[in-house]
């Protein structure tokens, strides 16, 4: 069984968009670098060094496609030596074994709209009217995508990485933005349902613990 929460979406992705590794696509083939802005440059930021921004180290991104932790740091402490990103950007772990394990997520709720994080992330920024962050996340979390990327890593031992050039030149069938948004809606709805179920299970466990406590 797939331990990943994303496992539910693999078949949905294939059904809607086909095998992303196939060159026989129903949609026009594009370089991934044409479908998103890869590792966008940091703009001039009107923040003081004491202003807070969100900080996301590698451990804050789970292997099932979610942010599990995010802290606030003073901009002056993290403005150098870290990766820059914004809300709705997609993070892709480029180093082994994080890449093979599926680390990646869409970033939301950044303090002052700015995030800084590990240099071992590639950042994929969706282009308005061309790509959805949920399609980009789903594509880059597909096991077949990661397996192909693993074969194209450079470096040695525990320092192997997926290059920005590899992602830039990866050929993929680009679905119409309407189809991507339909996939996004399905993804969000299923995610919301899982959240409700998880909260209900926690509530039931709490009740059960209380009742057992009374018996004891």
Stretches with model-predicted labels:
Residues 1-45, 176-184, 188-216:
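Non-catalytic DNA-recognition/assembly elements of restriction-modification systems
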Residues 25-28, 45-53, 151-153:
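Short coil/turn segments at secondary-structure boundaries
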Residues 33, 43-78:
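DNA target-recognition patches
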Residues 72, 78-79, 110, 156:
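Short, solvent-exposed loop/turn positions at domain surfaces
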Residues 81-83, 87-141:
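A short beta-sheet element
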Residues 114-122, 154-181:
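A short glycine-rich beta-alpha junction/loop motif
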């Amino acid at each position: 069984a797939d331990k990943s929460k994303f496992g539910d979406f693999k078949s949905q992705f294939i059904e809607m968009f086909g095998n992303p590794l196939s060159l026989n696509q129903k949609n026009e083939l594009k370089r991934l670098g044409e479908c998103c802005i890869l590792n966008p440059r940091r703009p001039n930021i009107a923040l003081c060094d004491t202003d807070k921004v969100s900080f996301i180290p590698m451990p804050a991104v789970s292997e099932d496609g979610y942010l599990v932790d995010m802290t606030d740091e003073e901009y002056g402490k993290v403005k150098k030596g870290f990766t820059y990103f914004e809300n709705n950007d997609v993070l892709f772990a480029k180093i082994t074994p994080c890449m093979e394990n599926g680390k990646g997520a869409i970033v939301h709720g950044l303090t002052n709209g700015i995030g800084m994080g590990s240099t071992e992330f590639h950042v994929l920024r969706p282009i308005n009217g061309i790509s959805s962050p949920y399609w980009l996340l789903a594509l880059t979390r597909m096991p077949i995508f990661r397996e192909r990327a693993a074969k194209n890593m450079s470096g040695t031992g525990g320092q192997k990485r997926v290059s920005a050039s590899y992602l830039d030149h990866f050929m993929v069938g680009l679905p119409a933005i309407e189809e991507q948004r339909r996939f996004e809606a399905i993804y969000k709805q299923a995610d919301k349902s899982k959240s409700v179920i998880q909260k209900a299970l926690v509530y039931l466990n709490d009740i059960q613990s209380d009742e057992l406590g009374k018996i004891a």
